[in-house]
Amino acid sequence: MRRFIILATLLLGACTTPGGYVDGPSTPVITADDESIIAYIDKRLVEEYYWLDEVVEKEHTFNRRQQWEEYLPSALSKLVSNADDGGYNHNGQRVYYSFIREDKSTRTQTQGYGISVYPSILAFSNDELAFVVDYIYPDSPAAKSGLRRGDFVVTVNGTAILRSNYQSLLATLLNGTSSIELTYMRQTVAEDEAKSGRVTLSHFAYEENPVVHSEVIELGDRRVGYLVYTSFDADFEEQLMVALQEFHQAAISDIILDLRCNGGGNVSVAQSLASAILGVGYEGKTLCELRRNPLNKRDASTSVIDLRAEEVSLDMERLVVIGSKYTASASEMIIDGLRGLDVEVVLVGSTTEGKNCGMDVTRVRCGSTTVEYAPITFMCYNAKGRGDYGEGISPDVDLTVENVTGYSDEYYPLPRCIWGDASHDIALFAALNAIMEGDATRAVPFVGGGDKITTEVELPREFIGARYDI
């Protein structure tokens, strides 16, 4: 089997992913909108930022003669007490969870192709690269084309992806406004499937429904609800509850919550999900506390997030979670919050990101620009007062090293196959193995029909590695 190298992380924007580089000085043209937005940034930093004490001390050092898009990371870089607000990227640059961005639309529909690209690129040779499909939104142009999770995109509109052009081709793939042609290679195929192909994607409106996969897996005498959930998005809470209702109607005995691609989102949606999983027996018990700086002028109180009655009640006694280094924020709150109630939570995958803080998000119009602004304003603690997972939550089964399943993948969570394929998805295999209490030989035949997990895929060309600043 041939092996490959994962290259530099793609800096794809998301509200729960650290963002905002600290760049060098510049002399841009300052507009009235810049001044208005910077004043709003300052107001919330001084009044609400979790580390506002230091902001008050040092705000006189902030450089306000710059464009508003650059101001927030520049100001935050003057502080030393805010280590939990983000971290450092692979180039050693300081990045932040706190963000401000232009809010162009509040529509639930998105214009595009419906592809989420895995946050690392692969190299076939010194020059040739590939984008990896992380997941596809249901009913999107990409879904209708037959493109699927784990595919390697090797050309865009007939152009090979190279070090010299990958940035522009990635922009075309993510932000294109017309039809697009992609050539792909497929890692795992059935006997009658081609290992490569070409698709043309139309550009039209679709919904970014974060419930990207849901099914009930028959595992001997057990019925396992398997839910792949990519974001705690309040606009799609109804779709989440529909999936859980289907689990309830199927009388599932166990549940696997796949959060490996989920960087967080709305606390209320996480509250609803946890409430539905545990059921009415936990109503009124505290999932977490959101603690703010006592000097916060907008809201210095601690918000207590209690479990509540939901229309769906699964009454699970155990939760198996698939996680990764991209699992963060509200996803980690689910794991840590349930453990604070002494619920058994089995974490399979790798250490999570470690975002134990959150934001009070506001949207406001400043001059001619509407912005969405989310500075870190609170820290998360479970019912036992624990919240120290700033370095991430360690897995019970670490798939990147030797473990109890007998299978590992040093490149995890690189997508290998479609959702639900336990013969090739080592994480799903390990999660089912946990449900079967270590009987891996029982788990695989029931689901994938195979006798091993493919952790090294045979590729037509050799992968070699280098790091690229994206």
Short names for language-model regions:
Residues 108-155, 159-162, 226, 233-239:
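PDZ/PDZ-like domain segments forming the peptide/carboxylate-binding groove
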Residues 33-130, 179-213:
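Extended, small/polar residue-biased N-terminal targeting/export presequences
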Residues 1-4:
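Positively charged n-region of N-terminal signal peptides that target proteins for export
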Residues 155-252, 307:
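C-terminal, low-ordered peptide segments at domain boundaries
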Residues 225-227, 236-242, 246-247, 252-254, ...:
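C-terminal "post-core" interaction segments
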Residues 48, 122-124, 139-141, 159-161, ...:
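Solvent-exposed loop/turn segments at secondary-structure junctions
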Residues 7-35:
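Bacterial Sec-dependent N-terminal signal peptides
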Residues 110-114, 128-130, 148, 177-179, ...:
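Extracytoplasmic
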